[in-house]
């Protein structure tokens, strides 16, 4: 794990809207760890303007609810999350996840339920792509990089964390996300993904709910660069 200076990654609090800082500050004040994670951090490092920001914390959904009260709504069964409102803005706040002791999966290996809370070290390996696994603590001015994600961003490489076949079986929607991110960000796809990213692998998508499939397909075809 590398602890990088945010300034060296081109990051500063001046780039952040007040609503995400409000969420990070409230969780920190309550005694919890809190980071900005995912596409927001990735896009800032690429010099892009993120459309939203997500947070992650060691607080459980019920504890997040205690911090924010009526501003918070717990959603999800497969992946339990907290939706926190800051003014008119919505921030998705997730709890650090650990590998399931006994995964609830479909016959094809897709994870059907994943609410095993863990540490930040356990959480990063549960994420899909390395470029989405950067943990930014804006008040401390640091970025935690567990998987050389900064190098992947620098070299514009899309790389899955873990074995690609297993990660696609866990969540087949990642196949569509691979295509979308590669096109949207103009990244090359790592060879180990291309090796198993075949038309035959599309059968995994049969287990995905119509809602999730529609949502990700819509993102794929409505993004200008993806099209």
Give residue ranges: language-model regions.
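Catalytic cores of the polymerase beta-like nucleotidyltransferase superfamily
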Residues: 1-226
């Amino acid at each position: 794990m590398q602890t990088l200076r945010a300034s060296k990654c081109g990051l500063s609090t001046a780039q952040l809207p007040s609503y995400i800082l409000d969420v990070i500050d409230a969780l920190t004040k309550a005694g919890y760890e809190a980071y900005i994670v995912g596409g927001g951090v990735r896009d800032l490092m690429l010099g892009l303007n993120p459309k939203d920001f997500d947070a992650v914390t060691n607080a459980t959904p019920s504890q997040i609810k205690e911090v924010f009260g009526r501003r918070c709504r717990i959603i999800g069964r497969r992946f339990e999350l907290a939706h926190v409102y800051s003014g008119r803005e919505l921030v998705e706040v997730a709890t650090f996840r650990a590998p399931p002791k006994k995964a609830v999966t479909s016959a094809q290996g897709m994870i059907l339920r994943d609410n095993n809370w863990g540490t930040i070290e356990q959480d990063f390996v549960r994420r899909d792509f390395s470029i989405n696994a950067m943990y930014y603590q804006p008040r401390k001015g640091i970025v935690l990089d567990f998987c050389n994600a900064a190098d992947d961003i620098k070299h514009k490489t899309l790389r899955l964390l873990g074995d690609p076949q297993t990660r696609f079986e866990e969540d087949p929607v990642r196949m569509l996300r691979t295509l979308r991110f590669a096109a949207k960000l103009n990244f090359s796809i790592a060879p180990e993904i291309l090796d198993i990213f075949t038309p035959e692998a599309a059968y995994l998508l049969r287990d995905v709910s119509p809602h999730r499939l529609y949502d990700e397909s819509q993102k794929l075809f409505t993004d200008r660069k993806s099209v």
